[in-house]
Amino acid sequence: MMSLTELAAALRRPLVVGVTSFVLVSAFAVSELSDVDWEPSHFAAFGEEAREIRAYAEERLGSVVLRPQLGHDGRFFFVQANDPWVLEPEENALILDHPLYRTQRMFYPVVAGGLGFFGPDEIVWAMLVVNLVAMGVGAWAVARIATAMWASPWWGLAFLLNLGFISELDVGGAGIVAGAAAFGAVAMILNGRSWEGVALLTVAALTREVMLIVAVGAGFHLWRRGERREATATAVMPLAAVLSWAIYLRTRIDLEIGSAQVQGIGVPFVGLFEAFESWINNPLDLIVGLAVLLMLALFVRRAVLHDNLIGWAFLGFVPLTVVLTEEVWHSYFDITRAVAPLLTAFVLLVALGDDSPGKVSSESSLSEGA
């Protein structure tokens, strides 16, 4: 029988935090599924008014759960997962609203599509399972980082309880996988396993190209510490992977590159000012929007003041918010998804005090168990 001392030691292990997070988020998913007659298409977020993708899904799955209006991101990833290598774009990718933009985010649909071997019925379940596992992995990674800051690994719950990631789960988005890979990369770099970190940053960037911010930020921090080879690989290899996939896509999809393919990016500050007008009529959006702005200011101050890996890795999300459009800023649902990695990084950077992970050696407490 386990003694109290052994139990306490076990509860301090990041792996326990990850498993606990997986169990909790799975319980949430089970609760949601029970309300929709165990229909996994609920998490694919097909929309009533997205007629072409709705017909595509119903042809392959039969009756599906429909969300109001156009639905959300999961509907695009379902299409992509049915042809993750873009081998038949005329039947799949070209029904997406912005094919080049959507198919650039390839890693999540590749995994959910079983590398191209899963059928539609397996895919719609796999999309959910991948996100549930990623939520546990993300919590584990944040717990590992927290232990490097001489804090309780239970701060890993900052990943699980992140409103942006919870929303991503609900709509079948790729943000959880991207976030888990990014925080996993930071944990690996802190543990002196830079090449594993580079691999995870590549995964993150191929899941959501905005995660190149983390790669460049982490590389910049390593460069300033004199780790030039690791810094170069950290910044360059994820970018090379993203560019390589982009080139491949342009051999598969016969569309010209244009600004219409880029979503959510506009003239600096315009989106924020336009969103503020709509916030006046919605107190919840106003409160969340102002809280995000305050968090951005505090994050910049803390990152510059304490000069650590967490700060530099995620600092680039701050200037990104300046160019987000009104469509992203106007609702708490969308803005928290856009800055979800920054929300968790903010907890690590601000709430845990001055013991910064960027100043912990590779022989830190990260090496002490899972």
Describe the role of every protein-language-model region.
Residues 71-90, 94-120, 341:
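Short hydrophobic/aromatic helix or loop-helix immediately within or flanking a transmembrane segment
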Residues 25-42, 215-220, 224-319:
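Membrane-lumen/periplasm interface segments of specific transmembrane helices
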Residues 183-188, 195-222, 236-240:
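Membrane-interface alpha helices of multi-pass inner-membrane proteins
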Residues 100, 104, 115, 122-133, ...:
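Membrane-embedded glycan-lipid processing machinery
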Residues 100-104, 108, 112-116, 127-141, ...:
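Transmembrane alpha-helices of multi-pass, membrane-embedded glycan-processing enzymes
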Residues 141, 161, 168, 177-197, ...:
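Specific aromatic-rich, kink-prone transmembrane helix
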Residues 1-56, 367-370:
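Start-transfer (signal-anchor) and selected internal transmembrane alpha helices
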